[in-house]
């Protein structure tokens, strides 16, 4: 089989360490359908296929990788989708739900997590390798400079675990930064107790000017609130917990200009 060349435009850095691939595959709980995003050379795929407690599917956009994977895992070929995960109709393809795993392409890792969020009722769990700084940011707590939009949104519906750090030398080509593996598991939250679409808007607005007090970015998006002032308006977005953002969303719904 011809070797697959990593393509910079696709954000590809192929994992070469079998022990790490085995750890990633083992970090996912058993049962149900599993979708691997970006199968690459099949380093992780081989250990997922060894698991008899899951049904593995794959998503890959690189034609060279797809040809390689078809040759290496012919029985897996019918479940390997030639297409972009970000465009996949998960609700149609996996109406019973699907877990998501992968060595996520670094250039779209944040978009992958937003896709998971949009399908949170379908995705009970995800294990992904991303840039270390992204993993830290997602798992961060309020009060940290790394705490941001995805931190709040993911933590609203998922418990996030930083599992382990992965060094540069176990990839081909080696990335310029360290990587990390994180695990997302749906928490007990089924409804936030506020307008969830508005919650997302409030969080994004609050962090749009993260170094300023909340009143500035929120008034820019939702108007002057009829002159009303929330007691948290003097705080910054990075200091609010998920529960506080939920409460703030309820307040904005009552006092703001919501379109």
Residue ranges of model-derived segments:
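Catalytic cores of RNA-modifying enzymes
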Residues: 1-205, 243-259
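C-terminal lobe and adjacent flexible extensions of AdoMet/dcAdoMet transferase-like proteins
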Residues: 205-259
